[in-house]
Amino acid sequence: MEHEPSVSDLRVINTSDFMNPMVTQIWSNGRHQVRCAKVIRETHDVSTFTFSMNQPVLFFFKPGQFVTLELEINGERVMRSYTISSSPSIPYSFSITVKRVPDGLVSNWLHNNLRPGDLIAVHGPVGDFNCMDHPADKVLFLSGGVGNTPVMSMARWWFDTDSPV
């Protein structure tokens, strides 16, 4: 039976929930097959793609990290990395926010082809630019363009966990 994301999947959890012995599967790295659960057209050239696994699996990442998508486009294997824009407090899914690049092979393919229900391979998460490994009492971010997505993830995490930053 396939798992369809539901409202219960979107509940906010704490980091201690990741250590719950009742949880049987935690994905923290490696290559996995994920299903596109939702596509949100943010603007005419920016979309957010949300992914989940067929079975409930806690997807743990540090806010600011990225995943690498492995796609087959025009018969060729293509890999591109995108920062996760969602918060790890949403336990069974993650999102990437992608701006369409005029001549971008992958960004255009995602915008034109990826639909809810489609399967793709994902590697990761990885990356050292995150707020868990580099805690601070106060932060100031200046970002623009693709630099917004790691900041989105961090800000959402701090909000969801009532962080005092």
Descriptions of predicted regions:
Residues 15-119, 123, 137:
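Ferredoxin-reductase
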